[in-house]
Design a protein with these regions (language model features):
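Flexible linker/loop signature enriched in Pro/Ser/Thr and Pro/Gly
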Residues: 134-171
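Polybasic (Lys/Arg-rich)
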Residues: 169-245
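Loop-centered beta-sheet repeat module
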Residues: 77-139
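A structural signal for short hydrophobic beta-strand segments in well-ordered beta-sheet cores
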Residues: 119, 149, 211-212
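Bulky hydrophobic/aromatic content
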Residues: 5-103
């Protein structure tokens, strides 16, 4: 009989709950793979903890079914570590809810050759920040829509040769300027917002937002942001936002 022994777990219950909730709220992980990883995390906990997370059984099944997701992430990590290009097919959903690759003019799956620079999580999904050959601008790809990825021998293009990345990739600035991960140029936008949106403004733009002309009910805001993203952001808050320029 052993005495004076105790189990020191790697994660506290609250840390495990945060990790599990992160999986539950991630929209890009297929249902089966999500459940498998939740069960792995549960295995790191006590029976007492597992009894307290019954909400896991309510995991919705209306998730994407790209079972290549984790392989894709591994390949992108390897490509970025080795500084090499990748090729892949990029999928779109059909009316039957299935993902199918985009086709070229010959009705064959279109092959994208891409210079991968960074993986980011935004709006509950994984995105790849990249450059698509032979173009010179920044591209954003939903990782859960990438299929049939291959690691190429070609060295990755220097990001300083990519329009918008001439000074390198400043990730915090890039994310502030591209809240919806649209590609394209960033512009300086000024809009008037109701003051009750201040928390939302901080969530979306953070320190990149410049506030001025404050009144009792509204304030003016200037941000540098992707033009198309600004259009959709303003639509989302249409009753409370007026774009000035």
């Amino acid at each position: 009989l052993l005495t004076d022994w105790y189990l020191n777990r790697e994660f506290t219950n609250s840390e495990l709950r945060i990790l599990i909730d992160g999986l539950l709220f991630s929209k890009h992980i297929p249902y089966r793979q999500c459940r498998e990883r939740v069960e792995k995390l549960e295995g790191l906990s006590s029976q007492h903890f597992r009894a307290r997370v019954r909400h896991i059984a309510a995991l919705p099944q209306n998730r994407p079914d790209n079972r290549q997701l984790f392989y894709t992430i591994d390949m992108l990590d390897e490509a970025m570590e080795k500084g090499r290009q990748v090729s892949f097919h990029y999928c779109h959903a059909g009316m039957d809810h299935q993902l199918r690759p985009q086709m070229n003019e010959q009705r064959n799956p279109k092959e994208y050759v891409v210079n991968p620079y960074q993986l980011v999580a935004a709006n509950g999904r994984y995105y790849l920040i990249a450059n698509t050959e032979p173009h010179s601008n920044v591209s954003h790809y939903r990782v859960d829509r990438i299929s049939d990825i291959c690691l190429l021998e070609t060295p990755v293009k220097d990001p300083r040769q990519v329009q918008g990345l001439e000074q390198g990739l400043d990730l915090s600035q890039h994310m502030a300027e591209h809240p919806y991960l649209f590609a394209g140029e960033s512009v300086r936008a000024t809009f008037r917002a109701k003051k009750h949106l201040l928390n939302d403004l901080e969530d979306w733009f953070g320190p990149a937002a410049n506030y001025f002309h404050e009144t009792e009910s509204a304030l003016d805001v200037t941000v540098k942001v992707n033009q198309e993203a600004m259009f959709y952001w303003a639509l989302q808050y249409a009753p409370f936002v007026e774009v000035l320029e």
